[in-house]
């Protein structure tokens, strides 16, 4: 049967397409908006059956043009948290998602979609409960509002609906994201260009570089998506993070040491990297004060209860793999 991946030329979508290929799945309809043409590179080493622009896709899917569709991996969205055009964001992330959901429900198609930890905003608890959800930007609100629709629909849905609140995802195929690419990606490029990585200094009680996030490898994100794809009886909204909060220092230090290893140099401790000027701390910008999350950490209780028991890569493991991959692309 046919599979559909929206946002297929994007970061997570392309990784899902590649992972499906590795399982022998090639009857895939890739849906995206290639106005930003450089995203095509993410699909060059992938096998797909057809490509459709997102505007054409919604109408044809609703019309039943693709026959029996087993599953839709709905990764297509505007993920720029700095976007201020609310009308664009709501149309692209909310209305579009509702249209795809409605057709999946009507046709009995598995619906696996990208939500976001941005829904939690400035909360200090990261559990899938309404009372801790307080998005700080229109991107987070667009994801929040769609999750509320899902909560209303789930009790009567006859087919799978699985939403994943992605935390800070990093890994291959994110180059096109520019300023919205991961910290690991930017640290890698900064070190190659300047010979050092710059991190924020002390802020809000956190020592320099010790602000923490739940950094999750796209490898793990893909594995979780495929686990639920294999278990259509499991529905719900789930946090998708490692369950560990690790400091930005860990990202930077791993980037530096992996690049040193590739250059046949020995690893250094964080203190040694700072002492040698390989990591530099800059004053925390005034523009971000009061708007910056110093801590995120996924509560994995629901995910584990659903039966997903595989370990998640640590920053040291995942960023090391990613830097080696990036180095091979240069």
Curated annotation (Swiss-Prot):
GO terms for biological process: ADP-L-glycero-beta-D-manno-heptose biosynthetic process; carbohydrate metabolic process. Contains a large N-terminal NADP-binding domain, and a smaller C-terminal substrate-binding domain. The keyword S-adenosyl-L-methionine does not apply. Catalyzes the interconversion between ADP-D-glycero-beta-D-manno-heptose and ADP-L-glycero-beta-D-manno-heptose via an epimerization at carbon 6 of the heptose. NADP(+) binds at residues 11-12, 32-33, 39, 54, 75-79, 92, 143, 169, 177. The lineage of its organism: Bacteria, Pseudomonadati, Pseudomonadota, Betaproteobacteria, Burkholderiales. Substrate binds at residues 168, 179, 186, 200-203, 213, 292. Its EC number is 5.1.3.20. Its cofactor is NADP(+). The keyword NADP applies. Homopentamer. It comes from the Bacteria. It catalyses: ADP-D-glycero-beta-D-manno-heptose = ADP-L-glycero-beta-D-manno-heptose. Belongs to the NAD(P)-dependent epimerase/dehydratase family. HldD subfamily. It comes from Burkholderia lata (strain ATCC 17760 / DSM 23089 / LMG 22485 / NCIMB 9086 / R18194 / 383). This is ADP-L-glycero-D-manno-heptose-6-epimerase. InterPro entries: Epimerase_deHydtase (IPR001509), Heptose_epim (IPR011912), NAD(P)-bd_dom_sf (IPR036291). Keywords: Carbohydrate metabolism, Isomerase, NADP. One of its GO terms (molecular function) is ADP-glyceromanno-heptose 6-epimerase activity. The active site is at 139 (proton acceptor), 177 (proton acceptor). Pathway: Nucleotide-sugar biosynthesis; ADP-L-glycero-beta-D-manno-heptose biosynthesis; ADP-L-glycero-beta-D-manno-heptose from D-glycero-beta-D-manno-heptose 7-phosphate: step 4/4. It is an enzyme of class 5 (isomerase). Binds 1 NADP(+) per subunit.
